[in-house]
UniProtKB/Swiss-Prot annotation:
Family the entry assigns: Belongs to the PAPS reductase family. CysH subfamily.
Cofactor(s) this protein requires: [4Fe-4S] cluster
Annotated gene: cysH1
Cofactor binding, per record: Binds 1 [4Fe-4S] cluster per subunit.
Protein's recorded name: Adenosine 5'-phosphosulfate reductase
Presence of keyword Transcription: no
Broad enzyme group: oxidoreductase
Listed SUPFAM superfamilies: Adenine nucleotide alpha hydrolases-like
Catalytic activity line of the entry: [thioredoxin]-disulfide + sulfite + AMP + 2 H(+) = adenosine 5'-phosphosulfate + [thioredoxin]-dithiol
UniProt-listed GO biological process terms: cysteine biosynthetic process; hydrogen sulfide biosynthetic process; sulfate assimilation, phosphoadenylyl sulfate reduction by phosphoadenylyl-sulfate reductase (thioredoxin)
GO molecular-function terms, A-Z: 4 iron, 4 sulfur cluster binding; adenylyl-sulfate reductase (thioredoxin) activity; metal ion binding; phosphoadenylyl-sulfate reductase (thioredoxin) activity
Organism, as annotated: Neisseria meningitidis serogroup B (strain ATCC BAA-335 / MC58)
Classification via PANTHER family: 5'-ADENYLYLSULFATE REDUCTASE 1, CHLOROPLASTIC, 5'-ADENYLYLSULFATE REDUCTASE 3, CHLOROPLASTIC
Main location per the UniProt record: cytoplasm
Amino acid sequence: METTLFKPALWQIPHIGSGGETALAEKTETLKQRLHRIVGSHRDARFASSLAAEDMVITDLIAGENLNIGIFTLDTGLLHTETLNLLDRLGRAYPHLRIKRFRPVREDADRYVESKGRFAFYDSVEARRECCRIRKTEPLNRAIAGADAWLTGQRREQSATRTELPFAEYDAGRGIGKYNPIFDWSEHDVWAYILANNVPYNDLYRQGFPSIGCDPCTRPVKAGEDIRAGRWWWEGRNSKECGLHK
């Protein structure tokens, strides 16, 4: 008797039907205006791109509008091959853009591995947060040093901790303005823009990853699950942030 292995259906890129072009155009125009407002209000604004789908929308508009917003990403040293490949593709798609990479201090990362173990982040929330601090938070602080504003691709729909996310806020810990220009876009809006404008995106989205972080800390999500269920899945449901957005 043959045994058939059941494979659960995974999250998929939303199907985008016809008829929403006007609404998308209006949202896109609003997003453009927000980005222009940020540029007009700050001498040095920088966009922290995680290379997620929503970040690709913002990147495409920064390029298309020729906006004076610096773009950087955090290369944690633990990214998926697909994510690194996307960085190479972005260089070809937007040859006039320079996306800076910020990496962890090598000595700090090595010390963490030597003292705790290569996969210590699985052992406790504290150990995982320490890894995130070394590989994400500290490089972010260097990336925005000297800026007077930074931008994120956060959206209200992404998680329970972001439902009240505003367009503009003040990052008191770093003493600068912080903007979430795409905060009110839905997942459908994001993918409608990407597919309509042929914007590059991470190949992992086609493999059931709606939210993408470091390779050891991200896995595919089943259809119908919370989109961040694949992030740090071994922790509690309320522990789905890395500490960048305190």
